Amino acid sequence: FFPIIAGMAAKVICAITKKC
């Protein structure tokens, strides 16, 4: 369950900061 949340958080951060 945690890996899914971490993945979603990373995706959001990536989209906001444009740093992937």
Swiss-Prot record:
This is Brevinin-1SPd. GO terms for biological process: defense response to bacterium; defense response to fungus; killing of cells of another organism. Its main location: secreted. It comes from Lithobates septentrionalis (Mink frog). It comes from the Eukaryota. GO terms for cellular component: extracellular region. Disulfide bonds join 14-20. Belongs to the frog skin active peptide (FSAP) family. Brevinin subfamily. It is found in: Secreted. It holds the Pfam family Antimicrobial_1. Expressed by the skin glands. Keywords: Amphibian defense peptide, Antibiotic, Antimicrobial, Cytolysis, Disulfide bond, Fungicide, Hemolysis, Secreted. Antimicrobial peptide with activity against Gram-negative and Gram-positive bacteria (MIC=13 uM against E.coli, MIC=3 uM against S.aureus) and fungi (MIC=3 uM against C.albicans). Shows hemolytic activity on human erythrocytes (HC(50)=8 uM).
